Protein backbone atom coordinates (compact mmCIF):
# COMPACT_ATOMS: atom_id res chain seq x y z
CA UNK A 1 0.00 0.00 0.00
CA UNK A 2 1.08 3.57 -0.67
CA UNK A 3 1.75 5.99 2.18
CA UNK A 4 -1.46 7.89 1.39
CA UNK A 5 -3.51 4.67 1.38
CA UNK A 6 -2.06 3.65 4.75
CA UNK A 7 -2.81 7.06 6.30
CA UNK A 8 -6.39 7.14 4.96
CA UNK A 9 -7.01 3.58 6.16
CA UNK A 10 -5.68 4.36 9.63
CA UNK A 11 -7.68 7.60 9.82
CA UNK A 12 -10.83 5.66 8.97
CA UNK A 13 -10.01 3.09 11.63
CA UNK A 14 -9.37 5.84 14.18
CA UNK A 15 -12.68 7.52 13.32
CA UNK A 16 -14.68 4.29 13.63
CA UNK A 17 -13.05 3.29 16.91
CA UNK A 18 -13.15 6.81 18.35
CA UNK A 19 -16.77 7.47 17.48
CA UNK A 20 -17.71 4.12 19.00
CA UNK A 21 -15.84 5.06 22.19
CA UNK A 22 -17.59 8.44 22.19
CA UNK A 23 -21.01 6.77 22.09
CA UNK A 24 -20.31 4.76 25.25
CA UNK A 25 -22.15 6.47 28.10
CA UNK A 26 -21.92 6.03 31.84
CA UNK A 27 -25.07 7.35 33.53
CA UNK A 28 -25.89 9.40 30.46
CA UNK A 29 -22.46 10.99 30.12
CA UNK A 30 -19.95 10.09 27.40
CA UNK A 31 -16.90 11.52 25.67
CA UNK A 32 -18.84 12.36 22.51
CA UNK A 33 -16.62 13.53 19.68
CA UNK A 34 -13.69 13.56 22.12
CA UNK A 35 -13.64 9.78 21.83
CA UNK A 36 -11.91 10.18 18.46
CA UNK A 37 -8.84 11.54 20.27
CA UNK A 38 -8.62 8.39 22.36
CA UNK A 39 -9.23 6.24 19.30
CA UNK A 40 -6.22 7.93 17.71
CA UNK A 41 -4.13 7.32 20.83
CA UNK A 42 -4.98 3.59 20.80
CA UNK A 43 -4.18 3.17 17.10
CA UNK A 44 -1.01 5.24 17.49
CA UNK A 45 0.14 2.98 20.32
CA UNK A 46 -0.34 -0.04 18.05
CA UNK A 47 1.47 1.53 15.08
CA UNK A 48 4.35 2.46 17.40
CA UNK A 49 4.64 -1.14 18.62
CA UNK A 50 4.77 -2.46 15.05
CA UNK A 51 7.12 0.27 13.80
CA UNK A 52 4.69 1.81 11.28
CA UNK A 53 5.82 5.32 10.34
CA UNK A 54 3.34 7.86 8.94
CA UNK A 55 4.30 10.85 6.79
CA UNK A 56 4.39 13.88 9.12
CA UNK A 57 3.68 16.45 6.39
CA UNK A 58 0.54 14.65 5.20
CA UNK A 59 -0.72 14.30 8.76
CA UNK A 60 -0.07 17.98 9.43
CA UNK A 61 -2.06 19.03 6.36
CA UNK A 62 -5.01 16.81 7.33
CA UNK A 63 -4.94 18.16 10.88
CA UNK A 64 -4.93 21.81 9.82
CA UNK A 65 -7.54 21.36 7.09
CA UNK A 66 -9.83 19.55 9.51
CA UNK A 67 -9.48 22.41 11.98
CA UNK A 68 -10.31 24.96 9.25
CA UNK A 69 -13.47 23.07 8.24
CA UNK A 70 -14.56 22.80 11.87
CA UNK A 71 -14.15 26.44 12.91
CA UNK A 72 -15.51 27.78 9.60
CA UNK A 73 -18.71 25.74 9.85
CA UNK A 74 -19.12 26.85 13.48
CA UNK A 75 -18.85 30.49 12.38
CA UNK A 76 -21.46 30.02 9.66
CA UNK A 77 -23.79 28.32 12.13
CA UNK A 78 -23.61 30.88 14.95
CA UNK A 79 -22.88 34.00 12.87
CA UNK A 80 -26.46 35.30 12.60
CA UNK A 81 -26.86 35.19 16.37
CA UNK A 82 -23.34 36.26 17.34
CA UNK A 83 -23.77 40.01 17.12
CA UNK A 84 -27.28 39.82 18.55
CA UNK A 85 -25.85 38.00 21.59
CA UNK A 86 -23.61 40.99 22.31
CA UNK A 87 -26.58 43.30 22.72
CA UNK A 88 -28.27 44.16 25.97
CA UNK A 89 -30.16 40.88 26.41
CA UNK A 90 -26.97 38.84 26.36
CA UNK A 91 -24.57 41.17 28.15
CA UNK A 92 -25.09 39.56 31.54
CA UNK A 93 -24.60 36.01 30.30
CA UNK A 94 -21.61 36.94 28.15
CA UNK A 95 -20.09 38.88 31.04
CA UNK A 96 -20.09 35.79 33.26
CA UNK A 97 -18.80 33.68 30.36
CA UNK A 98 -15.87 36.08 29.92
CA UNK A 99 -15.25 35.76 33.67
CA UNK A 100 -14.88 31.97 33.31
CA UNK A 101 -12.51 32.33 30.36
CA UNK A 102 -10.48 35.01 32.14
CA UNK A 103 -10.13 33.00 35.37
CA UNK A 104 -8.94 29.96 33.43
CA UNK A 105 -6.31 32.09 31.69
CA UNK A 106 -5.07 33.47 35.04
CA UNK A 107 -4.81 29.95 36.47
CA UNK A 108 -2.80 28.79 33.45
CA UNK A 109 -0.29 31.61 33.96
CA UNK A 110 -0.04 30.91 37.71
CA UNK A 111 0.46 27.15 37.31
CA UNK A 112 3.06 27.75 34.59
CA UNK A 113 5.04 30.08 36.86
CA UNK A 114 4.57 28.41 40.26
CA UNK A 115 5.16 24.80 39.19
CA UNK A 116 7.45 25.46 36.22
CA UNK A 117 5.20 23.52 33.85
CA UNK A 118 6.50 23.69 30.24
CA UNK A 119 4.49 26.02 28.04
CA UNK A 120 3.37 23.36 25.48
CA UNK A 121 2.21 21.14 28.35
CA UNK A 122 0.20 23.80 30.20
CA UNK A 123 -1.45 25.03 26.98
CA UNK A 124 -2.42 21.46 26.12
CA UNK A 125 -3.78 20.97 29.64
CA UNK A 126 -5.70 24.24 29.28
CA UNK A 127 -7.34 23.12 26.02
CA UNK A 128 -8.28 19.74 27.48
CA UNK A 129 -9.50 21.19 30.76
CA UNK A 130 -11.91 23.51 28.96
CA UNK A 131 -12.81 20.77 26.41
CA UNK A 132 -12.08 23.13 23.50
CA UNK A 133 -10.35 21.56 20.52
CA UNK A 134 -9.88 24.72 18.40
CA UNK A 135 -7.88 26.28 21.24
CA UNK A 136 -5.53 23.30 21.01
CA UNK A 137 -5.00 24.00 17.32
CA UNK A 138 -4.45 27.70 17.95
CA UNK A 139 -1.92 26.99 20.70
CA UNK A 140 -0.03 24.48 18.59
CA UNK A 141 0.21 26.91 15.70
CA UNK A 142 1.51 29.89 17.67
CA UNK A 143 4.07 27.78 19.57
CA UNK A 144 5.34 26.37 16.28
CA UNK A 145 5.84 29.92 15.00
CA UNK A 146 7.65 30.80 18.23
CA UNK A 147 10.12 28.01 17.49
CA UNK A 148 8.95 25.24 19.80
CA UNK A 149 9.94 21.61 19.13
CA UNK A 150 7.75 18.49 19.27
CA UNK A 151 4.74 20.71 19.99
CA UNK A 152 1.93 18.59 18.56
CA UNK A 153 2.76 15.37 20.40
CA UNK A 154 3.33 17.00 23.80
CA UNK A 155 0.26 19.23 23.61
CA UNK A 156 -1.85 16.35 22.35
CA UNK A 157 -0.84 14.16 25.29
CA UNK A 158 -1.48 16.82 27.93
CA UNK A 159 -4.78 17.70 26.22
CA UNK A 160 -5.91 14.06 26.30
CA UNK A 161 -4.93 13.65 29.97
CA UNK A 162 -6.87 16.76 31.06
CA UNK A 163 -9.89 16.18 28.79
CA UNK A 164 -11.88 13.57 30.82
CA UNK A 165 -12.09 15.71 33.96
CA UNK A 166 -12.95 18.67 31.73
CA UNK A 167 -16.24 16.90 31.03
CA UNK A 168 -16.69 15.49 34.54
CA UNK A 169 -15.78 18.79 36.24
CA UNK A 170 -18.55 20.80 34.63
CA UNK A 171 -21.16 18.19 35.58
CA UNK A 172 -19.79 18.18 39.13
CA UNK A 173 -20.04 21.99 39.23
CA UNK A 174 -23.71 21.90 38.22
CA UNK A 175 -24.42 19.24 40.82
CA UNK A 176 -22.65 21.09 43.65
CA UNK A 177 -24.40 24.40 42.89
CA UNK A 178 -27.73 22.59 42.88
CA UNK A 179 -27.02 20.94 46.25
CA UNK A 180 -25.51 23.99 47.99
CA UNK A 181 -28.29 26.38 46.93
CA UNK A 182 -31.03 23.75 47.44
CA UNK A 183 -32.42 24.41 43.97
CA UNK A 184 -36.03 23.47 43.19
CA UNK A 185 -35.95 22.63 39.48
CA UNK A 186 -39.69 23.00 38.84
CA UNK A 187 -39.71 26.39 40.56
CA UNK A 188 -36.69 27.56 38.55
CA UNK A 189 -38.37 26.48 35.30
CA UNK A 190 -41.58 28.31 36.20
CA UNK A 191 -39.71 31.50 37.13
CA UNK A 192 -37.78 31.37 33.86
CA UNK A 193 -40.98 30.97 31.84
CA UNK A 194 -42.65 33.85 33.67
CA UNK A 195 -39.65 36.10 33.07
CA UNK A 196 -39.49 35.16 29.39
CA UNK A 197 -43.17 35.95 28.89
CA UNK A 198 -42.66 39.40 30.44
CA UNK A 199 -39.62 40.19 28.28
CA UNK A 200 -40.84 38.68 25.04
CA UNK A 201 -42.00 41.38 22.67
CA UNK A 202 -42.29 40.02 19.18
CA UNK A 203 -44.52 41.38 16.45
CA UNK A 204 -48.14 41.91 17.38
CA UNK A 205 -51.26 42.94 15.45
CA UNK A 206 -53.94 45.53 16.15
CA UNK A 207 -57.11 46.61 14.35
CA UNK A 208 -57.66 50.37 14.64
CA UNK A 209 -60.70 52.35 13.47
CA UNK A 210 -59.80 55.77 12.07
CA UNK A 211 -61.77 58.30 14.13
CA UNK A 212 -59.34 61.23 14.01
CA UNK A 213 -61.07 63.74 11.69
CA UNK A 214 -57.74 65.44 10.95
CA UNK A 215 -56.54 62.34 9.11
CA UNK A 216 -59.61 61.86 6.91
CA UNK A 217 -58.75 62.53 3.27
CA UNK A 218 -55.01 62.09 3.79
CA UNK A 219 -52.93 59.54 1.95
CA UNK A 220 -51.43 56.70 3.97
CA UNK A 221 -47.91 58.09 3.50
CA UNK A 222 -49.04 61.40 5.05
CA UNK A 223 -49.98 59.83 8.40
CA UNK A 224 -47.72 61.02 11.26
CA UNK A 225 -44.83 58.60 11.93
CA UNK A 226 -45.49 56.70 8.69
CA UNK A 227 -41.90 57.33 7.55
CA UNK A 228 -40.50 55.79 10.74
CA UNK A 229 -41.17 52.32 9.24
CA UNK A 230 -42.04 50.88 12.65
CA UNK A 231 -45.56 49.75 11.70
CA UNK A 232 -46.87 47.83 8.69
CA UNK A 233 -50.35 48.66 7.34
CA UNK A 234 -51.16 45.28 5.81
CA UNK A 235 -54.96 45.54 5.31
CA UNK A 236 -57.71 48.13 5.25
CA UNK A 237 -61.42 47.41 5.69
CA UNK A 238 -63.87 50.00 4.37
CA UNK A 239 -67.48 49.11 5.06
CA UNK A 240 -67.47 45.42 4.09
CA UNK A 241 -64.72 45.70 1.49
CA UNK A 242 -61.16 44.52 2.21
CA UNK A 243 -58.34 46.45 0.56
CA UNK A 244 -54.56 45.99 0.45
CA UNK A 245 -53.43 49.60 0.97
CA UNK A 246 -50.44 51.28 -0.64
CA UNK A 247 -48.73 54.55 0.20
CA UNK A 248 -51.17 56.54 -1.96
CA UNK A 249 -54.36 55.01 -0.54
CA UNK A 250 -56.65 57.82 0.70
CA UNK A 251 -58.06 57.22 4.18
CA UNK A 252 -61.64 57.86 5.23
CA UNK A 253 -62.97 58.31 8.75
CA UNK A 254 -64.40 54.93 9.80
CA UNK A 255 -61.78 52.86 7.94
CA UNK A 256 -60.37 49.94 9.93
CA UNK A 257 -56.62 49.44 9.56
CA UNK A 258 -54.86 46.16 10.37
CA UNK A 259 -51.46 47.09 11.85
CA UNK A 260 -48.41 44.87 12.44
CA UNK A 261 -45.59 45.92 14.77
CA UNK A 262 -44.33 45.87 18.33
CA UNK A 263 -47.00 46.27 21.00
CA UNK A 264 -45.77 49.63 22.33
CA UNK A 265 -45.59 51.09 18.83
CA UNK A 266 -49.06 49.85 17.95
CA UNK A 267 -50.54 51.54 21.03
CA UNK A 268 -48.82 54.77 20.05
CA UNK A 269 -50.34 54.60 16.55
CA UNK A 270 -53.76 53.87 18.04
CA UNK A 271 -53.60 57.18 19.92
CA UNK A 272 -52.86 58.94 16.62
CA UNK A 273 -55.42 57.15 14.46
CA UNK A 274 -58.40 56.50 16.69
CA UNK A 275 -59.72 53.56 18.67
CA UNK A 276 -59.20 49.83 18.79
CA UNK A 277 -61.77 48.05 16.64
CA UNK A 278 -63.28 44.69 17.53
CA UNK A 279 -63.69 43.84 13.86
CA UNK A 280 -62.37 40.90 11.85
CA UNK A 281 -59.99 41.94 9.09
CA UNK A 282 -59.28 38.35 8.09
CA UNK A 283 -58.68 37.40 4.46
CA UNK A 284 -61.05 34.43 4.82
CA UNK A 285 -63.96 34.56 2.45
CA UNK A 286 -62.37 37.37 0.42
CA UNK A 287 -60.32 37.57 -2.76
CA UNK A 288 -57.21 38.18 -0.64
CA UNK A 289 -54.83 35.65 0.86
CA UNK A 290 -52.07 35.69 3.46
CA UNK A 291 -49.28 33.28 2.56
CA UNK A 292 -45.61 32.72 3.29
CA UNK A 293 -42.81 32.59 0.73
CA UNK A 294 -39.05 32.21 1.07
CA UNK A 295 -36.43 34.31 -0.73
CA UNK A 296 -34.28 32.03 -2.91
CA UNK A 297 -33.91 33.97 -6.18
CA UNK A 298 -30.34 35.26 -6.43
CA UNK A 299 -31.54 38.23 -8.51
CA UNK A 300 -33.20 39.82 -5.46
CA UNK A 301 -30.43 39.17 -2.92
CA UNK A 302 -29.35 42.48 -1.43
CA UNK A 303 -32.22 44.41 -3.02
CA UNK A 304 -34.21 46.75 -0.82
CA UNK A 305 -37.88 45.92 -0.44
CA UNK A 306 -38.95 49.30 -1.82
CA UNK A 307 -37.03 48.65 -5.04
CA UNK A 308 -39.23 45.61 -5.73
CA UNK A 309 -42.30 47.91 -5.71
CA UNK A 310 -44.57 45.09 -4.60
CA UNK A 311 -47.34 47.40 -3.38
CA UNK A 312 -47.36 49.61 -6.45
CA UNK A 313 -47.03 46.93 -9.13
CA UNK A 314 -48.79 43.94 -7.61
CA UNK A 315 -50.83 45.25 -4.66
CA UNK A 316 -49.02 42.84 -2.37
CA UNK A 317 -47.90 43.80 1.13
CA UNK A 318 -45.09 42.14 3.09
CA UNK A 319 -46.56 42.12 6.59
CA UNK A 320 -43.76 40.20 8.33
CA UNK A 321 -40.20 39.10 7.64
CA UNK A 322 -38.60 36.18 9.46
CA UNK A 323 -34.80 36.04 9.33
CA UNK A 324 -32.97 33.23 11.10
CA UNK A 325 -35.95 32.72 13.42
CA UNK A 326 -36.34 36.41 14.31
CA UNK A 327 -39.41 38.37 13.18
CA UNK A 328 -38.59 41.81 11.79
CA UNK A 329 -40.58 44.82 10.56
CA UNK A 330 -40.20 44.64 6.75
CA UNK A 331 -39.64 48.33 6.01
CA UNK A 332 -38.71 49.56 2.55
CA UNK A 333 -35.03 50.08 3.39
CA UNK A 334 -34.49 46.47 4.43
CA UNK A 335 -32.39 44.38 2.01
CA UNK A 336 -33.51 40.83 1.31
CA UNK A 337 -31.27 37.87 2.09
CA UNK A 338 -31.32 34.23 1.06
CA UNK A 339 -33.65 32.29 3.32
CA UNK A 340 -35.77 35.26 4.44
CA UNK A 341 -39.37 34.14 5.00
CA UNK A 342 -41.91 36.76 3.92
CA UNK A 343 -45.57 36.92 4.92
CA UNK A 344 -47.40 38.16 1.79
CA UNK A 345 -50.91 39.66 1.76
CA UNK A 346 -52.73 40.19 -1.54
CA UNK A 347 -54.74 38.52 -4.28
CA UNK A 348 -53.82 34.92 -5.01
CA UNK A 349 -52.62 35.65 -8.55
CA UNK A 350 -50.56 38.62 -7.36
CA UNK A 351 -48.98 36.56 -4.59
CA UNK A 352 -48.04 33.89 -7.14
CA UNK A 353 -46.38 36.57 -9.28
CA UNK A 354 -44.39 37.86 -6.29
CA UNK A 355 -43.57 34.28 -5.30
CA UNK A 356 -41.98 33.78 -8.73
CA UNK A 357 -39.97 37.00 -8.32
CA UNK A 358 -38.46 36.12 -4.95
CA UNK A 359 -37.99 32.42 -5.77
CA UNK A 360 -39.76 30.38 -3.09
CA UNK A 361 -37.82 27.30 -4.22
CA UNK A 362 -37.74 25.28 -1.00
CA UNK A 363 -35.39 22.70 -2.48
CA UNK A 364 -32.71 25.40 -2.64
CA UNK A 365 -32.75 25.55 1.15
CA UNK A 366 -31.33 22.02 1.13
CA UNK A 367 -28.66 22.71 -1.48
CA UNK A 368 -25.09 23.70 -0.63
CA UNK A 369 -23.45 26.40 -2.73
CA UNK A 370 -19.80 25.36 -2.74
CA UNK A 371 -18.27 28.53 -4.18
CA UNK A 372 -19.03 30.72 -1.12
CA UNK A 373 -17.61 28.03 1.18
CA UNK A 374 -14.21 28.12 -0.46
CA UNK A 375 -14.32 31.91 -0.82
CA UNK A 376 -14.93 32.11 2.93
CA UNK A 377 -12.23 29.57 3.78
CA UNK A 378 -9.72 31.35 1.53
CA UNK A 379 -10.49 34.75 3.05
CA UNK A 380 -10.32 33.23 6.53
CA UNK A 381 -6.88 31.73 5.94
CA UNK A 382 -5.65 35.07 4.56
CA UNK A 383 -7.04 36.96 7.56
CA UNK A 384 -5.53 34.42 9.93
CA UNK A 385 -2.13 34.89 8.29
CA UNK A 386 -2.08 38.67 8.67
CA UNK A 387 0.43 39.63 11.38
CA UNK A 388 -0.42 42.09 14.14
CA UNK A 389 2.82 43.48 15.50
CA UNK A 390 2.76 44.48 19.16
CA UNK A 391 5.82 46.23 20.66
CA UNK A 392 7.77 43.95 22.98
CA UNK A 393 6.34 40.70 21.57
CA UNK A 394 8.85 38.32 19.93
CA UNK A 395 6.40 37.33 17.19
CA UNK A 396 3.38 38.94 15.60
CA UNK A 397 -0.03 38.00 16.95
CA UNK A 398 -2.19 36.22 14.38
CA UNK A 399 -5.70 34.85 14.37
CA UNK A 400 -4.19 31.77 12.76
CA UNK A 401 -5.93 28.93 10.95
CA UNK A 402 -8.35 28.56 13.85
CA UNK A 403 -9.26 32.23 14.39
CA UNK A 404 -9.17 33.62 10.84
CA UNK A 405 -11.79 31.33 9.27
CA UNK A 406 -13.97 31.71 12.38
CA UNK A 407 -13.99 35.53 12.24
CA UNK A 408 -14.62 35.59 8.48
CA UNK A 409 -17.43 33.03 8.82
CA UNK A 410 -19.08 35.09 11.57
CA UNK A 411 -18.98 38.21 9.41
CA UNK A 412 -20.14 36.50 6.20
CA UNK A 413 -22.97 34.69 7.99
CA UNK A 414 -24.10 38.01 9.44
CA UNK A 415 -23.97 39.71 6.02
CA UNK A 416 -25.88 36.81 4.48
CA UNK A 417 -25.21 37.45 0.82
CA UNK A 418 -23.06 39.53 -1.52
CA UNK A 419 -24.46 39.70 -5.02
CA UNK A 420 -25.27 36.16 -6.11
CA UNK A 421 -23.12 34.59 -3.41
CA UNK A 422 -24.91 33.61 -0.21
CA UNK A 423 -23.47 32.10 2.93
CA UNK A 424 -26.52 30.14 4.02
CA UNK A 425 -25.76 26.49 4.71
CA UNK A 426 -28.42 23.86 5.47
CA UNK A 427 -28.09 22.67 9.08
CA UNK A 428 -27.49 19.07 7.99
CA UNK A 429 -24.69 20.11 5.63
CA UNK A 430 -23.15 22.38 8.25
CA UNK A 431 -23.21 19.58 10.82
CA UNK A 432 -21.63 17.12 8.38
CA UNK A 433 -18.84 19.55 7.46
CA UNK A 434 -18.22 20.38 11.12
CA UNK A 435 -18.11 16.73 12.22
CA UNK A 436 -15.80 15.70 9.36
CA UNK A 437 -13.45 18.55 10.25
CA UNK A 438 -13.25 17.78 13.95
CA UNK A 439 -12.89 14.03 13.34
CA UNK A 440 -9.93 14.64 11.00
CA UNK A 441 -8.31 17.03 13.46
CA UNK A 442 -8.72 14.85 16.55
CA UNK A 443 -7.67 11.71 14.67
CA UNK A 444 -4.32 13.24 13.75
CA UNK A 445 -3.80 14.74 17.21
CA UNK A 446 -4.40 11.31 18.71
CA UNK A 447 -2.07 9.60 16.23
CA UNK A 448 0.70 12.07 17.06
CA UNK A 449 0.20 11.86 20.82
CA UNK A 450 -0.37 8.15 21.31
CA UNK A 451 3.14 6.70 21.19
CA UNK A 452 4.10 7.81 24.71
CA UNK A 453 0.65 8.50 26.14
CA UNK A 454 0.33 5.46 28.42
CA UNK A 455 3.78 5.90 29.96
CA UNK A 456 3.08 9.58 30.60
CA UNK A 457 -0.37 8.92 32.08
CA UNK A 458 0.97 6.43 34.63
CA UNK A 459 3.95 8.57 35.62
CA UNK A 460 3.97 11.10 38.51
CA UNK A 461 4.22 13.80 35.87
CA UNK A 462 1.02 12.61 34.21
CA UNK A 463 -0.86 12.58 37.52
CA UNK A 464 0.28 16.15 38.14
CA UNK A 465 -1.04 17.15 34.71
CA UNK A 466 -4.41 15.68 35.64
CA UNK A 467 -4.40 17.74 38.84
CA UNK A 468 -3.55 20.96 37.00
CA UNK A 469 -6.35 20.25 34.53
CA UNK A 470 -8.84 19.69 37.34
CA UNK A 471 -7.91 23.06 38.86
CA UNK A 472 -8.30 24.89 35.53
CA UNK A 473 -11.67 23.20 34.95
CA UNK A 474 -13.25 23.40 38.36
CA UNK A 475 -12.24 26.69 39.99
CA UNK A 476 -13.48 29.10 37.26
CA UNK A 477 -16.77 27.22 36.97
CA UNK A 478 -17.56 27.04 40.67
CA UNK A 479 -16.44 30.64 41.41
CA UNK A 480 -18.45 32.08 38.52
CA UNK A 481 -21.40 29.84 39.35
CA UNK A 482 -21.51 31.15 42.92
CA UNK A 483 -21.12 34.79 41.82
CA UNK A 484 -23.81 34.45 39.13
CA UNK A 485 -26.22 32.77 41.53
CA UNK A 486 -25.64 35.02 44.57
CA UNK A 487 -25.02 38.43 43.00
CA UNK A 488 -26.44 37.95 39.50
CA UNK A 489 -29.60 36.20 40.76
CA UNK A 490 -29.32 33.92 37.75
CA UNK A 491 -31.85 31.19 37.11
CA UNK A 492 -30.31 27.76 37.76
CA UNK A 493 -31.29 26.31 34.37
CA UNK A 494 -29.81 29.33 32.58
CA UNK A 495 -26.70 29.01 34.75
CA UNK A 496 -26.24 25.39 33.65
CA UNK A 497 -26.45 26.50 30.01
CA UNK A 498 -23.95 29.28 30.74
CA UNK A 499 -21.44 26.85 32.28
CA UNK A 500 -21.85 24.44 29.34
CA UNK A 501 -21.47 27.23 26.78
CA UNK A 502 -18.44 28.74 28.53
CA UNK A 503 -16.75 25.35 28.14
CA UNK A 504 -18.16 24.87 24.59
CA UNK A 505 -19.16 21.41 25.78
CA UNK A 506 -22.12 19.71 24.00
CA UNK A 507 -22.17 16.69 26.38
CA UNK A 508 -22.58 19.11 29.29
CA UNK A 509 -25.43 20.84 27.47
CA UNK A 510 -27.11 17.48 26.94
CA UNK A 511 -26.80 16.85 30.69
CA UNK A 512 -28.19 20.35 31.46
CA UNK A 513 -31.15 19.77 29.14
CA UNK A 514 -31.98 16.54 30.95
CA UNK A 515 -32.24 18.38 34.30
CA UNK A 516 -35.65 19.62 33.13
CA UNK A 517 -36.86 17.65 30.11
CA UNK A 518 -38.33 19.71 27.31
CA UNK A 519 -37.23 23.05 28.77
CA UNK A 520 -35.16 25.39 26.58
CA UNK A 521 -33.56 27.63 29.23
CA UNK A 522 -30.17 25.89 29.21
CA UNK A 523 -29.99 25.71 25.42
CA UNK A 524 -30.88 29.40 25.11
CA UNK A 525 -28.10 30.61 27.41
CA UNK A 526 -25.66 28.12 25.82
CA UNK A 527 -26.36 29.56 22.37
CA UNK A 528 -26.07 33.12 23.69
CA UNK A 529 -22.53 32.74 25.04
CA UNK A 530 -21.17 30.11 22.63
CA UNK A 531 -20.05 32.41 19.76
CA UNK A 532 -18.12 34.88 21.92
CA UNK A 533 -16.61 32.13 24.07
CA UNK A 534 -15.47 30.15 21.03
CA UNK A 535 -13.73 33.26 19.71
CA UNK A 536 -12.06 33.95 23.08
CA UNK A 537 -10.99 30.31 23.51
CA UNK A 538 -9.12 30.55 20.19
CA UNK A 539 -7.49 33.92 20.92
CA UNK A 540 -6.57 33.28 24.59
CA UNK A 541 -4.02 30.45 24.07
CA UNK A 542 -2.23 32.60 21.51
CA UNK A 543 -2.03 35.52 23.92
CA UNK A 544 -0.91 33.24 26.75
CA UNK A 545 1.71 31.60 24.55
CA UNK A 546 3.22 34.91 23.46
CA UNK A 547 3.08 36.55 26.90
CA UNK A 548 4.48 33.54 28.77
CA UNK A 549 7.11 32.88 26.10
CA UNK A 550 8.23 36.51 26.33
CA UNK A 551 8.33 36.42 30.13
CA UNK A 552 10.39 33.21 30.29
Curated annotation (Swiss-Prot):
Its main location: membrane. Pfam families: Asp-Al_Ex, TrkA_C. One of its GO terms (cellular component) is plasma membrane. GO terms for molecular function: monoatomic cation transmembrane transporter activity. Residues 190-275, 277-360 form the RCK C-terminal domain. It is found in: Cell membrane. One of its GO terms (biological process) is potassium ion transport. Keywords: Cell membrane, Membrane, Repeat, Transmembrane, Transmembrane helix, Transport. It is a multi-pass membrane protein. It comes from the Bacteria. PROSITE patterns: RCK_C. SUPFAM superfamilies: TrkA C-terminal domain-like (SSF116726). The chain crosses the membrane at residues 4-24, 29-49, 65-85, 95-115, 161-181, 370-390, 402-424, 438-458, 463-483, 492-512, 529-549. HAMAP family: YidE. Belongs to the AAE transporter (TC 2.A.81) family. YidE subfamily. PANTHER family: K(+)_H(+) ANTIPORTER SUBUNIT KHTT (PTHR30445), TRANSPORT PROTEIN YIDE-RELATED (PTHR30445:SF3). This is Putative transport protein APL_0966. It comes from Actinobacillus pleuropneumoniae serotype 5b (strain L20).
Amino acid sequence: MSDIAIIVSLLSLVAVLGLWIGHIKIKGVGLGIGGVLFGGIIISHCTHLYGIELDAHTLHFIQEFGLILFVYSIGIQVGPGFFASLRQSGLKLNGFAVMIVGLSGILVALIHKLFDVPLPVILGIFSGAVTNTPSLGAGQQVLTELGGDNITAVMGMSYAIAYPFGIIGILLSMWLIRIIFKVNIDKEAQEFDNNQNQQKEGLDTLNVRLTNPNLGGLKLKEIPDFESHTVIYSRLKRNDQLIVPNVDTVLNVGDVLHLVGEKATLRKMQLILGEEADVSVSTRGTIFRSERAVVTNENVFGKKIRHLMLKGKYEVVISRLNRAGVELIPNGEMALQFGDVLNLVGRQEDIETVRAIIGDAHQKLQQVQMLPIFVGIGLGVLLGSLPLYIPGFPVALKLGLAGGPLVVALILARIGSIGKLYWFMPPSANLALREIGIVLFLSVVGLKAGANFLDTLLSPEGLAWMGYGAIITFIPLIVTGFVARIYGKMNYLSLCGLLSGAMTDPPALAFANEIKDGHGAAALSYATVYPLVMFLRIILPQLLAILLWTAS
